[in-house]
Amino acid sequence: MNEFQLKYGCNPNQKPSRIFMADGSDLPVEILNGRPGYINFLDAFNGYQLVKELKKATGLPAATSFKHVSPAGAAVGLPLTDVEKKIYWVDEAIGELSPIACAYARARGADRMSSFGDFISLSDVCDVAIAKLIQHEVSDGIVAPGYEPEALEILKAKKKGNYNIIKIDPEYKPEPIERKQVFGVTFEQGRNEFVIDKELLSNVVTENKEITESAKIDMIIALITLKYTQSNSVCYVKNGQAIGIGAGQQSRIHCTRLAGQKADNWYLRQNPKVLNLPFKDGVGRADRDNAIDLYIGDEYEDILNDWERVFTEKPSVFTVEEKKEWLAGNTDVTIGSDAFFPFGDNIERAYKSGVKYVAQPGGSVRDDQVIETANKHGMAMCFTGMRLFHH
């Protein structure tokens, strides 16, 4: 199959629509179920590149959760703590999770509000454990290099049998030149084949030169995630997973703030007050996620004024002081940026979210100010020398 007809393009009025191989060769994908759309394929092809590179760079199974051609989460397959299982709604009945299942639980769980209706990409074969995780989530589809038979049957039952399931050829190598059209004009460029690995992290420019091995993995996760995130972008990472991604902002500091707030929310969800919220039986995951998002945010009164809808009793206010005290316990976080930090204010904001390690290209006329700010907070910062814009 060298062509696949789509229902429409980005919007229903954009017809005709298709994906095809210009050279007449076969597409590197097989549609096992459903009818993926234009944006589904954009998510699938970007997401699969991300997880394939993460697996190659870290040696660990990787997963990502995409929405509108940017990752909402990305992670490698490290074991989950009991608290992480709880905030990611991992059902104990599923049993022991495989590394690739842990990777998806982390990728989906980092920013559950943004991952609602996601497109999933896996570096490894989709097993039964992942299928059972996905079974209870609102998701548009999945791409993976293969599927266990039982896992495939579980997934095929989603969305009344219409769940989008794509199998991709892991040996496929795209052409070295990319082309796309905008306003009838064809753009051409070489593919971004830049390799992100530990060697890229050798230029440590701060007084603190100590970067742990786990922090290096987190830096790699941040940078590879940014490589496939709409620019400008900033990514916070901890323990093998993105915990806050700021995508598509015109201002670097707004990226840093947006991603930092998401990272803060990820950590606030682990507070006992949030873990023990008295949800009514039968309240679905999406409603719980929405309630938690309101409860830990500035608009908490909206959920407390309507508490009877989702809670058995009215929760107490999660005060600013309580949140500040809890967030102080979030440490050893890594931040990556797809382009240089132009001012020290980005570092100051990152510090508020527990950042200790920084990976960025460098190259600002104010690099000295940025380094000075990082030194003030005892951070270790490396300059990679490589911009990672993605559009």
Model-derived segments and spans:
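C-terminal binding/interaction regions
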Residues: 118, 122-123, 127, 136-166, ...
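Glycine-rich phosphate/pyrophosphate-binding loops
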Residues: 61-62, 67-72, 76-78, 233, ...
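Active-site-proximal loop/turn and secondary-structure-junction residues that shape catalytic pockets
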Residues: 70, 126, 239-241, 249, ...
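Flexible, glycine/charged-enriched surface loops at secondary-structure junctions
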Residues: 57-65, 165-168, 231-238, 268-279, ...
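Gly-rich Lys/Arg/Thr-decorated short loops/hinges at beta-loop-alpha junctions or inter-strand turns
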Residues: 23-35, 110-116, 189-209, 286-307, ...
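Active-site loops and adjacent core secondary-structure elements that bind or stabilize anionic groups
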Residues: 1-200, 215-233
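Conserved helix-loop functional segments at active or binding sites
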Residues: 53, 228, 265-269, 352, ...
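Glycine- and Gly-Pro-enriched alpha-helical subdomains that act as flexible
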Residues: 72-112, 243-340
